[in-house]
């Protein structure tokens, strides 16, 4: 049983999948940092200092009643909130990630199509044109079936 597991684990697909998951996790962290640290602060500045992570709606107030300035204050008070600012951050992160994956898949498909075109052997023509009546005839024909000319 241990031998079978070792063969399964060392197959190329399993190892490739593990590497993909690890790189995907690191790429996800990179995209999250890009969104939270580089894109959202300038966007918040353009929108007059709005911090998207603190955009929320109080559904039910906590023990000290609101208004709550920050999401952390509302959470500390035990308020039930709808955190749409965090959703906006996650949505922007998802769109960036989806676009990056789209570009990656598009590049891989182009490379595949280029390698398939170069690997495909040149197909020899199977037909030719009769020089007398200009109809298409088999390449090995010695007489045209249309005009009966000797080729």
UniProtKB/Swiss-Prot annotation:
GO terms, molecular function: mechanosensitive monoatomic ion channel activity
SUPFAM superfamilies: Gated mechanosensitive channel
Topology term for the membrane: Multi-pass membrane protein
Cellular localization per UniProt: Cell inner membrane
Keywords from the UniProt entry: Cell inner membrane, Cell membrane, Ion channel, Ion transport, Membrane, Transmembrane, Transmembrane helix, Transport
GO CC, any one term: plasma membrane
UniProt xrefs under InterPro entries: Mechanosensitive_channel_CS, MS_channel, MSC/AndL, MscL_channel
Main location, first listed in the record: membrane
Record bears the keyword DNA-binding: no
Function of the protein: Channel that opens in response to stretch forces in the membrane lipid bilayer. May participate in the regulation of osmotic pressure changes within the cell.
Protein family (similarity comment): Belongs to the MscL family.
Protein's UniProt name: Large-conductance mechanosensitive channel
Lineage, top ranks: Bacteria, Pseudomonadati, Chlorobiota, Chlorobiia, Chlorobiales
Gene name of the encoded protein: mscL
């Amino acid at each position: 049983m241990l031998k079978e597991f070792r063969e399964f684990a060392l197959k190329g697909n399993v190892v490739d999948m593990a590497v993909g998951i690890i790189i995907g996790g690191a790429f996800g962290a990179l995209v999250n940092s890009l969104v939270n640290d580089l894109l959202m602060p300038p966007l918040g500045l353009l929108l007059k200092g709005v911090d998207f992570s603190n955009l929320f709606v109080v559904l039910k107030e906590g023990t000290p009643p609101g208004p709550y300035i920050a999401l952390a204050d509302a959470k500390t008070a035990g308020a039930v909130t709808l955190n749409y600012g965090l959703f906006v951050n996650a949505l922007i992160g998802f769109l960036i990630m989806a676009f990056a994956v789209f570009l990656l898949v598009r590049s891989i498909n182009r490379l595949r199509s280029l390698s398939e075109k170069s690997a495909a052997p040149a197909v020899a023509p199977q037909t030719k044109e009769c020089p007398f009546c200009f109809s298409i005839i088999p390449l090995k024909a010695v007489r045209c079936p249309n005009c009966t000319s000797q080729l």
